[in-house]
Design a protein with these regions (language model features):
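Active-site loop-to-helix junction immediately N-terminal to the catalytic Tyr of the SDR YXXXK motif
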Residues: 535, 582-589
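Conserved glycine-rich Rossmann-like NAD(P)H-binding loop of the short-chain dehydrogenase/reductase
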Residues: 466-480
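Residue(s) in the substrate-gating loop at a strand-loop-helix junction
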Residues: 576
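Glycine-rich flexible loops
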Residues: 1-444, 456
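Substrate-binding pocket helix/loop in short-chain dehydrogenase/reductase
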Residues: 531-532, 539-541
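A short, exposed helix-loop element centered on a Lys and neighboring polar residues
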Residues: 555-556
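Canonical Rossmann dinucleotide-binding motif of NAD(H)/NADP(H)-dependent dehydrogenases/reductases
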Residues: 442-467
């Protein structure tokens, strides 16, 4: 059994696995975590994994088979015991007796709770029957880019046979749920001995008798599809119809993105304020610079996990890569018609496909925005969500790349996409999300936040839900101040408030990371305690530059970003008690 792979990471640590002994649940969790660590295998929150064990029924004291499966809303990369559901396998299979057909699909979810074995279980997900109706001890349901490329190809079933022969099954697209579980069961009955099943426009199911065998089987199947795609790309000589244009140099791309991000943020925040993210990943640039961009992008994504986070299609900016962005008002006026058209298109999509009981239409602004020659922006309610949306669209690009190489890419019909996006079960999941904090969707830049009052203010802003850019002249202080935060919460930037160039760099970094800035807190300061006769002109100038000129420069740069966003803003200058009653030798006040 080979452990050498070119397109996926082999992460199984035999020493770690051995330390888990024969604890099959622990081994299933370990497998889940290492699968989720490779975004080529499955994206954040996507896919699910399971195992089946023999346990003692607490009432009858008889041995029963229990299925342990990732619960609703979890992520296999970080899955723990508290994130799984334990269900009686036989009782779950008995639900076939009460299943009333696909039009009553959603009522089955409530019945999963009547199959619970472990009373500490996470809520079972909609994919629970897909695992329960298959007999295997360990099962992986994954969303690898290469596999979805096969699943989304126009002749997906034939390509499945071309790659794996008779060792893989195939089922056409079906919304996740009990009916899809029945289709998998039937596929296995018709094709005994297969190693897995390709789900049309969706993903992959693989299995094994042990956690390790399941893991290796998943990697091998993904490797085979990846190898098939890459050989086709090599034979074709190009992807996406070749390159229509070239990207700007890296430094210029970042400069354009930093200038444009606050304008885009404002346009995307017409209904609800958003946080931004920017990517100029090589995969993104290859796609947005290609001849096929205008054909493929409007088609929309295929895998449900993708468009649930990215919306069905992106907005492509009608700007040249080297567009002069100095006049933000003119740029906004140029872009506004595109945003209005996108929003009207989304409203039409909703109205054309909604059902009488559909949830209310959500924000109609684009999530993904493509700027040919520069990169990709994403906007959502918080940094983690917008970053993940960007990652998911990169997954979608990889899927289109693979499908186009081996066949023709096909997206889900709009009605199918709508029925997933506005599924009542998805809406219920959204309603269970924690309530937003007072400063959620806000970005703050705090000077002098490497320590002291500035750091305390920055910490408080984060605690209230804001994203924060910590700035200071000490890299060591900044490193310590931000050590406990992820980059989804805060970033650090060395900034000298006496230098306009340094301040502008901090705002550019904030714009690239979060899309802009809403709150400025000027807390940078210093004290020079000397008698007047010992105070030099340089001392005096430094005090005035930091305490007075710094406020002016900071406010001036903030105003530029605030005007670009057109969302207002707040500037807070921290004053010293010495400004009212100066202490001894504080002549600067």
């Amino acid at each position: 059994m080979s452990t050498n792979f070119n397109y996926v990471n082999y992460l199984w640590d035999e020493k770690k696995a051995t330390s888990l002994g024969d604890d099959q649940v622990a081994l299933f969790l370990y497998r889940s975590n290492i699968l989720g660590a490779d975004l080529r295998i499955t994206n954040y929150g996507g896919g699910n994994t399971s195992c089946k064990t023999i346990e003692s029924d607490p009432v009858t004291q008889k041995d029963v088979e229990v299925m342990w499966v990732k619960g609703s809303g979890g992520d296999i990369g970080t899955l723990t015991r508290s994130g799984i559901a334990g269900l009686y396998t036989e009782r779950l299979r008995d639900l076939k007796k009460v299943y009333r057909g696909i039009e009553h699909e959603d009522e089955m979810v409530a019945l999963f709770n009547h199959c619970i074995y472990d009373l500490d279980s996470k809520a079972p997900s909609i994919d629970t029957p897909l695992h329960g109706l298959l007999p295997f001890k360990h099962i992986d349901h994954l969303h690898p880019d290469a596999l979805i490329a096969v699943a989304a190809a126009a002749d997906s079933e034939q390509i499945t046979k071309d790659i794996w022969g008779d060792t893989m099954g195939w089922v056409p697209w079906q919304k996740p749920g009990f009916d899809l579980g029945l289709q998998l069961e039937e596929c296995l009955a018709q094709n005994p001995g297969i190693r897995g099943i390709v789900l049309g426009s969706h993903g992959l199911f693989t299995w094994g008798d042990t956690s390790y065998e399941c893991y290796i089987n998943s990697l091998e199947v993904i490797e085979m599809s990846s190898d098939y795609i890459e050989k086709k790309i090599k034979a074709n000589g190009s992807v996406f119809g070749g390159q229509k244009m070239t990207s700007l140099p890296k430094e210029q791309r970042l400069s354009q993105a930093a200038q444009l991000a606050p304008i885009l943020r404002g346009l995307c925040s017409s209904d609800n304020q958003m946080i931004g993210h920017f990517s100029d990943d090589a995969v993104v640039l290859e796609y947005i610079n290609s001849h096929d961009l205008e054909r493929l992008a409007p088609m929309g994504t295929s895998c449900p996990d993708h468009f649930l986070r990215t919306k069905i299609a992106p907005l492509i900016l009608n700007l040249s890569a080297d567009e002069n962005l100095d006049d933000s008002k003119a740029v906004r006026e140029k872009l506004t018609p595109s945003f209005e058209a996108y929003k009207k298109g989304y409203e039409a999509y909703y109205n054309d496909h909604k059902h009488p009981n559909s949830p209310a239409m959500r924000d109609s602004s684009p999530v993904i925005i493509l700027f040919p020659g520069v990169g990709m922006f994403s906007f959502a309610k918080n940094k983690q969500t917008t970053r993940v949306a960007s990652e998911f669209y990169i997954n979608a690009i990889n899927v289109m790349r693979g499908s186009e190489a081996i066949s023709k890419y096909t997206s889900l019909p709009r009605q199918e996409a709508f029925d997933i996006e506005y599924w009542l079960l998805e809406e219920a999941k959204l309603q269970r999300m924690p309530k937003e904090q007072p400063l959620s969707r806000k970005v703050a830049l705090v000077t002098g936040s490497g320590g002291g009052i500035g750091r305390a203010i920055a910490d408080k802003l984060i605690a209230e839900g804001a994203n924060v850019v910590f700035t200071d002249i000490s890299d060591d202080f900044l490193k310590e101040a931000t050590a406990s935060y992820s980059t989804d919460q805060a970033i650090a930037c060395n900034c000298d408030v006496t230098s306009k160039e340094s301040i502008d760099t901090a705002f550019a970094k904030a714009s690239l990371q979060f899309g802009g800035v809403d709150i400025i807190v000027h807390s940078a300061g210093l004290a020079i305690s000397k008698p007047i006769e010992d105070t030099s002109q340089a001392d005096w100038d430094l005090l005035q530059n930091v305490l007075v000129k710094g406020q002016f420069l900071l406010a001036q740069s903030a105003a530029v970003v605030f005007r670009k966003q057109n969302l207002g803003g707040n500037i807070v200058n921290i004053a010293s008690k010495n400004g009212l009653v100066a202490g001894p030798n504080n002549l600067g006040y």
